[in-house]
Amino acid sequence: VKRAHDWGHPAIAITDHGVVQGFTDANHVIEDLDKDDPFKVIYGVEGYLVDDLTKIAENEKGQDLEGTYVVFDIETTGFSAVTDRIIEIGAVKVEDGKITDKFSTFVNPKRPIPFRITELTGITDEMVIGSLDIETILPQFIEFIGDAVLVAHNASFDVGFIEQNCKRQKIEADFTYVDTVALARVLLPALNRFKLDTVAKALNISLENHHRAVDDAGCTAEIFVKFVQMLKERELTTLAKVNEFGDLNPDSIKKLPTYHVIILARNDIGRVNLYQLVSASHLVYYNRRPRIPKSVLNEHREGLIVGSACEAGELYRALLDGKPDETIAAIVDFY
């Protein structure tokens, strides 16, 4: 701080990772300066933000847990719904807790499959070259879905690809979808990781040919059926109630992935709110690192400047992953 002052900087911001212990020493430097010296210290933190605003059931419309669900999985040429392509869709329909129908097909991506994807999935160019393209397959899959609620493991990824392809083909899409990763966080709190094979093992469900869409979809369906039973035991009968259950569970927040966020105090109110955020991150939501839920940040946002941070920030990661423009716009709007 003193060096920044001596070099002629008008101000310096302190943004240590997750803590504010440096504030006292910085304040001592300010106290040693002349009272008329305009140099300022901006108090802040580089926090670990978690998105607890995402629901277990996105876009729910009051559906009952006894309804019809399409549990699905896709394999793709990469992670970007914008620039990569679907190479396999596997899905099963679940009605009254039972699998009643299946949908399984390769999709011709009209481009070579990257070697790393072939290594992961076992899907080769030869396996998809004679398949129909997504322009033909997608309407068939939409018809298979009908009015059902979609279910997937890490659903935003799979649904994101389907929605992006619907957008390209000008197919109207208004899906309700349930994420079994989010369900696992609240129903299996003893787990530290929530990959499909980890959750399946915890529930004694067999998973063969992992990273093949139809097999992963079948496994996810069995997981979902067990989760529905666990939810009913808690007297949760609608997707709206399931979302409320997830909202009230701080243990699930502790398991969410983190993004870096820059938080600066604009004034004394902001400084108090900053202290409250840091305290909550350590005392309530700590798990390997101090976590700040988005909902808690919104409650204490007065007097704060919130920035999207570095390459580990939510916005940077979304751009790098090629997220759709609507997703990018929503992230920008938060900051």
Task: List where the protein language model places each region.
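Phosphodiester-processing cores and adjacent nucleic acid-binding clamps
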Residues: 1-80, 85, 90-103, 110, ...
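Conserved catalytic alpha/beta cores of large enzymes that bind or transform nucleotide phosphates
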Residues: 134
